[in-house]
């Protein structure tokens, strides 16, 4: 991948705003804060902002920056780990002078002035690792590397996803060479709290299993909030179903109410082998071939999507 255009845009900009997707995971925030830190460490005087409204509670992260409309309008916006513009966690990114998209999702909805896409990468953090490593004249600090390693580790599920390649492992090696405490980082991002442990028990005891191969659970708002979780955190527990050998397709759905009080469903969908992102796309969602998401499903949508997922086992 030719990173020269991205580097040149960063060099020329006085103000840079960095965005990522809604319901952020460690790859989204890891790539965001890694890029911010790398720019700040190498380009003194630039104004760099990490934008977004939502947070993830998987590991500890810096706070997002509070940014005015005027700042965004005078910036270049770099949008990370976001397949389509509807999923950017702050619609004001569109006000920027220029928009650069850096992503590892299939580019089914290109947006922005510049798109740097590598959909064979296991994580956007993998892409940025090679970007930073390409230009060895710049500082690539351990702090930047740790942000990236968190995202790489979680999006590849500890190097177990089917899009983990030798390039993914090479990226991990580059990051490890900065002196990271790999064991500590792994525990930080994967270990459960007591609440998380109890919530895992809830998921296991309430999972529906069809044909001994398709597993799903629907978690209502009252339940996940009682464990101190938001909806995004609750859906991130979808990985707990991956350890069952017989489950080839699995999903976690959370409920919410719209303005009229109607129940809607958001879901995290996973498959060990067969493609499912085309199913997500039928309902306005998307993602990777074997890891996708959907939002704002009606009860009728739920019936349909469960039937379609069941057919992919």
Explain the meaning of each model-derived region.
Residues 68, 89-91, 115-117, 138-139, ...:
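A generic local secondary-structure boundary/capping motif
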Residues 35-36, 94-97, 117-118, 170:
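Glycine-rich, phosphate-binding/catalytic loops in enzymes
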Residues 104-171:
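Short alpha-helices
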Residues 60-114:
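Active-site cofactor/cluster-binding pocket
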Residues 2-22, 26-60, 68-75, 156-313:
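Hydrophobic helix-and-loop "lid/oligomerization" segment in the mid-to-C-terminal part
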Residues 19, 23, 79, 101-102, ...:
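Generic enzyme active-site microenvironment
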Residues 1-5, 80-81, 132-134:
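Short, motif-level signal for alpha-helix interfacial/capping segments enriched in acidic residues
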Residues 70-71, 92-94, 108-109, 140-141, ...:
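Solvent-exposed alpha-helices and their adjacent loops that cap or buttress functional pockets
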């Amino acid at each position: 991948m030719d990173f020269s255009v991205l580097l040149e845009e960063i060099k020329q900009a006085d103000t840079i705003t960095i965005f990522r997707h809604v319901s952020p995971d460690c790859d989204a925030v890891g790539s965001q804060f890694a890029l911010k830190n790398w720019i700040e460490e190498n380009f003194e005087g630039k104004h760099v902002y990490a934008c977004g409204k939502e947070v993830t509670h998987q590991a500890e992260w810096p706070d997002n920056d509070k940014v005015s409309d005027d700042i965004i309008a005078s910036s270049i916006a770099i949008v990370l780990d976001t397949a389509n513009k509807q999923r950017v966690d702050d619609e004001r990114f569109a006000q920027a002078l220029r928009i650069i998209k850096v992503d590892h999702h299939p580019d089914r909805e290109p947006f922005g002035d510049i798109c740097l896409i590598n959909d064979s990468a296991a994580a956007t953090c993998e892409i940025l690792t090679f970007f930073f490593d390409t230009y060895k004249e710049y500082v690539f600090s351990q702090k930047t590397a740790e942000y990236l390693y968190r995202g790489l580790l979680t999006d590849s599920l500890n190097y177990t996803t089917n899009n983990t390649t030798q390039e993914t492992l090479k990226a991990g090696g580059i990051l490890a060479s900065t002196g990271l405490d790999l064991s500590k980082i792994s525990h930080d991002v994967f270990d459960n709290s007591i609440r998380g442990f109890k919530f895992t028990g809830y998921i296991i005891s309430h999972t529906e299993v069809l044909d001994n191969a398709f597993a799903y659970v629907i978690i209502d708002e009252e339940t996940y909030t009682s464990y101190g979780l938001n909806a995004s955190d609750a859906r991130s527990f979808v990985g707990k179903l991956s350890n069952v050998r017989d489950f080839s397709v699995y999903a976690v759905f959370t409920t919410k109410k719209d303005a009229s009080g109607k129940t809607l469903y958001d879901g995290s969908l996973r498959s060990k082998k067969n493609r499912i992102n085309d199913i997500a796309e039928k309902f306005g969602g998307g993602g990777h071939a074997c890891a996708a998401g959907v939002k704002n499903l009606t009860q009728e949508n739920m019936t349909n999507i469960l039937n379609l997922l069941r057919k992919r086992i």
